[in-house]
C-alpha cells in the first residue's frame, strides 16, 4: 500500500490545493500524516481511515474543515488532539470509531466551539466507562449527537450519498443542526424521504429521530401528545 503522501498526490490530480474541498486518504501504510499542506484552505471534509495512525502530529492548518473521519486507527494516549483545536477550529463532526481512546484523551475537544457530533463507537475503554454518554455530553457542551444518538438517547438517522450526501429535510429540523456544507453535495429524491409510506399504515420519514431501542415503546413526547388529545 502507498504512503499517505503518495495517496495525497494521486487524489490531488494536479489540482490547485486551494480548490479542493474533499479528500480521501484512506489505507495509507506508513502510519503517519504526511504530504498535506496548509494550502488546503477550503478543505471541508478529510478522511484518513485505516492509516495506522497513533498520533495526529503533522496535521496541517485547515481553517474550513468541518468533518474529519479518522476511524479504524490506533489513536490513544499519544493522539495529540490538541492539534485539532489549533489547526481545525471549525470542526463540527469527528468520527473516531474503532480506536483506543479514553475519556482523558478527548478532554481538549471541549474547546472546539462548533463540535456538534462525535462517533466514538468501538473504543473498548469508553464502552466500559460508567455513565459514558452523560459524561461526554457534560464534558463537551456543544455536543448534540454521540454515536448516532442525541442527548435523550434517540437515534438520529443520517443519510449520505457518495462522498457527501444530504440529510433529508425532516432530518435536519433542529435549528441548531450542523449545517455542514459537505452534506449539500447530493440530494435524495422525495420518494426516498418525505413521501415514503409503506402499505398498511403511516411510516416515519427517513432522516428523523426515532427511539434508539426497538422495543416498540413510544417516546415520552409522543405519549404526552396523545394525552393532550
Swiss-Prot record:
Residues 155-229 are annotated as: Disordered. GO terms for molecular function: histone binding. LRR repeats lie at residues 19-40, 42-63, 64-85, 90-110. Residues 124-164 form the LRRCT domain. Gene3D superfamilies: Ribonuclease Inhibitor. The keyword Repeat applies. Residues 219-229 have a biased composition (Basic and acidic residues). This is Acidic leucine-rich nuclear phosphoprotein 32-related protein 1. Belongs to the ANP32 family. GO terms for cellular component: nucleus.
